[in-house]
Curated annotation (Swiss-Prot):
Transmembrane segments: none annotated. This is ADP-L-glycero-D-manno-heptose-6-epimerase. Its EC number is 5.1.3.20. Substrate binds at N168, S179, H186, F200, A201, G202, S203, R208, Y271. Its cofactor is NADP(+). Binds 1 NADP(+) per subunit. NADP(+) binds at residues 10-11, 31-32, 38, 53, 75-79, 92, 143, 169, 177. Keywords: Carbohydrate metabolism, Isomerase, NADP. PANTHER family: ADP-L-GLYCERO-D-MANNO-HEPTOSE-6-EPIMERASE, NUCLEOSIDE-DIPHOSPHATE-SUGAR EPIMERASE. Contains a large N-terminal NADP-binding domain, and a smaller C-terminal substrate-binding domain. InterPro entries: Epimerase_deHydtase, Heptose_epim, NAD(P)-bd_dom_sf. One of its GO terms (molecular function) is NADP binding.
C-alpha cells in the first residue's frame, strides 16, 4: 500500500494520479474534507481507502499497523502563506510531520514530504542549505524548521527520507485553493467572466520559477523509484514573469489584454519578487526530468481547465 497525505489536495491528488498511471490503486488517501469541494479531485482517480487526517495521526501515534507500506508521500499541510495562527500552523505542519516521519523511520518506510521555496524568504540564491534560508511568514518557518529537523536525522536514517522545496506550482486540481490558487487559474477565470486578465503593478519585474504540477508529481515518483534521500529544490531552474503566464492564458483563449492593478499593501515586505530553483543538487542525484516552460505548462493546463 502507498499512503498519500493531502491526497485530495492539489499536489497530493496529482501524485495519486501518477501512481494510478503506474497501475497502483492500493492507495490510502489522508486528508481533511471539511472543505467538501476537494472531493472532486478524487472522482476520476482510483484509491483503496480514505482516512481523516486527525484519525490518521491518532493511529500513527498509537503505532497502529497499516500492513505493508511501500511509501508515504506527505503532502498534507496548511499551505496558506497568509495564515498567521502560528500555534495552528506549527501543530498542523511541524508536529504532525515529525510524528509521521518517526513512524516511517521506525519501520523503514520511504518517506517523501513537501517542503517549500517559502523557506528561502527574500533571499536571491536558492540553494538547499541553511545559510540561504530565511522565511518571511509562519508557513515558511514551519517548513524550514522541519527541513532542519530532517537534516539532523538524515545521517542515521536507514530508509529514504526526501523533501522537496516546491517553487510556484500550478496546474490541474488546484481549484479548491481559492486565493492561494495559481495566477494562471485566476487569469483564466477572469477571461471566462469577460474581463481582461489583471496583474499587479510591477509584475513585469516579478520573476518566479513556475513549475507544472505534473512535473512535480513526476519528481516525487522518480525519488521513490530510485530510493532517494535528501532535501531538493523542485522547480524548473528558470525564472519567468507573471506577464509570460498572462500571455500564455491569453493565447489559449485568443482574446484579452493585460490590465494593471495596484499592488496590495498587505503583501508588501512579505512578497517574493524573484524565485529560481538551483537544480544542481537534484541533477547530481540523477534526476534528468525536462521541466515544462510556462508556455508549455500553461497551454496544457488551459486545455485541461477548459475541457468540455
Amino acid at each position: 500500500m502507498i499512503i498519500v497525505t493531502g491526497g485530495a489536495g492539489f499536489i497530493g491528488s496529482n501524485i495519486v494520479k501518477s501512481l494510478n498511471d503506474l497501475g497502483r490503486k492500493d492507495i490510502l488517501v489522508v486528508d481533511n474534507l471539511k472543505d467538501g469541494t476537494k472531493f472532486i479531485n478524487l472522482v476520476d482517480l482510483d484509491i483503496a481507502d480514505y482516512c481523516d487526517k486527525e484519525d490518521f495521526i491518532a493511529q500513527i501515534i498509537a503505532g497502529d499497523d497499516f500492513g505493508d507500506i511501500d511509501a508515504v508521500f506527505h503532502e498534507g499541510a496548511c499551505s496558506a502563506t497568509t495564515e498567521w495562527d502560528g500555534k495552528y500552523i506549527m501543530h498542523n505542519n511541524y508536529e504532525y510531520s515529525k510524528e509521521l516521519l518517526h513512524y516511517c523511520l521506525d519501520r523503514e518506510i520511504p518517506f517523501f514530504y513537501a517542503s517549500s521555496a517559502a523557506t528561502y524568504g527574500d533571499k536571491t540564491e536558492f540553494v538547499e542549505e541553511r545559510q540561504f534560508e530565511g522565511p518571511l511568514n509562519v508557513y515558511g518557518y514551519s517548513k524550514f524548521l522541519f527541513d532542519q529537523y530532517v537534516r539532523e536525522i538524515l545521517p542515521n536514517a536507514s530508509s529514504p527520507v526526501c523533501g522537496f522545496k516546491y517553487f510556484n506550482v500550478y496546474g490541474p486540481r488546484e481549484q479548491h485553493k481559492g486565493s492561494m490558487s495559481s495566477v494562471a487559474f485566476h487569469l483564466n477565470n477572469q477571461i471566462l467572466k469577460g474581463e481582461n486578465p489583471k496583474l499587479f503593478a510591477g509584475s513585469e519585474h516579478f520573476l518566479r520559477d513556475f513549475v507544472y504540477v505534473g512535473d512535480v508529481a513526476a519528481v516525487n515518483i522518480w525519488a521513490w523509484q530510485n530510493k532517494i534521500s535528501g532535501i531538493f529544490n523542485c522547480g524548473t531552474g528558470h525564472a519567468e514573469s507573471f506577464k509570460a503566464v498572462a500571455e500564455a492564458v491569453i493565447k489559449h483563449h485568443g482574446k484579452g489584454a493585460i490590465e494593471t492593478i495596484p499592488f496590495p499593501d498587505h503583501l508588501k515586505s512579505r512578497y517574493q519578487e524573484y524565485t529560481q530553483a538551483d537544480l544542481t543538487k537534484l541533477r547530481a542525484a540523477g534526476c534528468n526530468l525536462k521541466f515544462k516552460s510556462v508556455a508549455e505548462g500553461v497551454a496544457e493546463y488551459m486545455a485541461w481547465l477548459n475541457r468540455k
